[in-house]
């Protein structure tokens, strides 16, 4: 784990309420794996000793990118940071996704849950592993970075609650349609998911019932990042796990959903 002072290279709005933060972070960029996260200290907050956790959207060439949604005081304060300024960033933290896959990698995300999935898709593309993305949002504006997945050659299956783009409904609607075809063809596949709990439970249930690997990135508020505060608990078959050190990526068969 590293603690770097990172220059802000770019900080731009990429949609209503969504921003992309690009940092010069050579140490973290060379060490981080898809699914791991970083802790960012937000100077504008009085309690800035407590850092905010963010998934890594991409990393390489000495840079780390973070895609985030403005949802509270922490991210609202982070919005004020400008290119040319610097931030204290700690990472990489947590356990990420496996970077191997037997068959087709089915990436399932909701909203900004696509953030770690893009990093993973890029790694899979470099290894010649086929990925397919199933992504959901309330409206088309909540479907992020589809052009970047397209550039990797990833076939995308968008879904929106209001039917404004792609299939009407949740991401599991096009996922289930694709699963039928894969099973009929006898194709191997694995699940990789990140997003709201309802989506993660749905993907976990499918992985367990089909007896195939499922890797689930659980979204919790990881305050300390090192397992000390027990604020990011997730129930598992072995008891309570701390998402910041035991996850955030878990095997679907180990998760217990209430």
Specify the residue positions occupied by each region the protein language model found.
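FNR/FR-type flavoprotein reductase catalytic core
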Residues: 73-216
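Local cysteine-cluster metal-coordination motifs and their immediate loop/turn environment
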Residues: 197, 219-248
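Short gly/pro/ser/thr-enriched loop/turn and capping motifs at secondary-structure boundaries
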Residues: 140-142, 164-165, 221-225, 250
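Short, Lys/Arg- and Gly-enriched loop/turn segments at beta-strand edges
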Residues: 45-54, 94-101, 244
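Short microdomains enriched in Cys/His and/or Lys/Arg
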Residues: 245-258
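Ferredoxin-reductase
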Residues: 2-83
